[in-house]
Amino acid sequence: MLASTFATHPAAAAAARRRGPIRWRLPFCSQIVTVTLRRRFPMARLSITNALASQSLESAPAAPPKHSFPILVNSCTGKMGKAVAEAAVSAGLQLVPVSFSAIEVPDGKVEICDREIYIRDPSEGESILPSIAKDYPDMIVVDYTVPDAVNANAELYCKLGLPFVMGTTGGNRQLLHKTVEDANVYAVISPQMGKQVVAFLAAMEIMAEQFPGAFSGYKLEVMESHQATKLDISGTAKAVISCFQKLGVSFNLNEVKQVRDPQEQLTLVGVPEEHLSGHAFHMYHLTSPDETVSFEFQHNVCGRSIYAEGTVDAALFLHKKIQSGANKKLYDMIDVLREGNMR
């Protein structure tokens, strides 16, 4: 839900002051990122055929339609990765039956949409990925792992020349972009994969560029709530805060109120109980220096499907760019949105 409030009368401002700290409105849910890989990707040499000899790939589904391409999801043991894998199958893409995760699973495999996905340890990544890429030409990797693995994983994908979509937040983002640019590898990197939220971010960027300093002197309060497994500050919140800073607002990231306690999420934030394990609620409240004017922006997401669908759109976009031999290699979700590739 996106809400915006504008108060100019002193009585309205007084009411706002009596209200106290920012509160969440009743949520509107549309549909975040749980993560798994805990180790980096060091190494031992074998082909995918040998590596999975005891786990024959013959059980994999028949070849997909000609317009499709292979997609490898890291990691299918996480809720976000699983959601992306399911969305990829629904879109007619060929789900590579291998994924890397430090989490042990029964029989070393998981089942997604009647497909068996064999789980390999991250330490085998450098030795196995080249064989997988050979067996699955035109493969695109999707990364939903953990913040600590972002840079190491991207470095590995770039080293092997594998195009990828980085949905994992966190890590050193400047280094991440530099790694991709230096390697000249195709990639989509975005802290936010939800298409409608990306459109909101784009609008914020336009406002910041067109009207710098418009909110100079205003006080900003930011609250974000995600499932307890999300370790870092919301990448979306960081992006919106950056826009407000360009608009003249003074704000430090350590001022963000992160809500991870389920009880607070229920009572303070208003997250539906069934979505405590997967949601993304954000509120930004601006108050003028004399407290006579206030603005409030809010966007709430329940579940993961909005991110999964956006990630698949990003992969489809990237595949199109690769096939056309586009000179530009590094993209974000705003590029995807502008292309009109949204399904």
Curated annotation (Swiss-Prot):
Q: Where is the transit peptide?
A: 1-14
GO-annotated molecular function: 4-hydroxy-tetrahydrodipicolinate reductase; NADPH binding
What's its EC?
A: 1.17.1.8
Q: Which domain of life is it from?
A: Eukaryota
* Keyword Transit peptide applies: yes
Give a short account of what the protein does.
Answer: Catalyzes the conversion of 4-hydroxy-tetrahydrodipicolinate (HTPA) to tetrahydrodipicolinate.
Name of the protein = Probable 4-hydroxy-tetrahydrodipicolinate reductase 1, chloroplastic
Gene of this entry: DAPB1
